[in-house]
């Protein structure tokens, strides 16, 4: 598991800049020296993870583990810490979410977090593709990494 206090703090702060307009997100990026790629700049849903992490560090003094969990909660990345995975998954399957497969994903998240990451990342990428939205490279890399881990695990249990 992970520290429940850290998870709670990350959960409270992870969307602290989400409601800001793109122009404000870009100003925060400039203020904190955040370099954004073209996919992030075109999508404030992704941009708020980076700016939120910086604001959480600067204004609330969160430790690096919480800052990183906030930073990666929208795209994911390969080899995430337990806290990073918990926040990513909690955000993806929160009670207000209603999409095909969310109930299965919620059950899986409580029993096998890495398997939930594989399924959640696949679902996210399929949803983006269906909507004609370019997925972030980190999300694709995360899925490839977790699928590789799944295959490694299968080899060790044969």
Locate the predicted segments by residue.
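Divalent metal-dependent catalytic cores for phosphoryl transfer on phosphate-bearing substrates
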Residues: 2-121
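Charged phosphate-binding loop/patch that engages nucleotide di/tri-phosphates or the phosphate backbone
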Residues: 126-158
């Amino acid at each position: 598991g992970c520290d429940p206090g850290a998870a709670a703090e990350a959960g409270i702060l992870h969307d602290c800049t989400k409601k800001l307009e793109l122009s404000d997100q870009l100003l925060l990026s400039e203020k904190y020296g955040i370099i954004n790629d073209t996919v992030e700049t075109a999508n404030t849903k992704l941009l708020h993870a980076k700016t939120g992490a910086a604001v959480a560090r600067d204004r609330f003094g969160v430790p690096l583990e919480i800052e990183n969990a906030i930073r990666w909660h929208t795209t994911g990345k390969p080899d995430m810490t337990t806290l990073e995975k918990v926040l990513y998954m909690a955000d993806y399957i929160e009670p207000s979410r209603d999409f095909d497969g969310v109930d299965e994903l919620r059950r899986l998240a409580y029993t096998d977090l890495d398997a939930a990451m594989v399924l959640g990342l696949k679902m996210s990428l399929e949803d983006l593709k269906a909507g004609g939205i370019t997925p972030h490279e980190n999300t694709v890399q995360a899925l490839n990494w977790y699928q590789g881990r799944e295959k490694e695990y299968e080899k060790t249990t044969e």
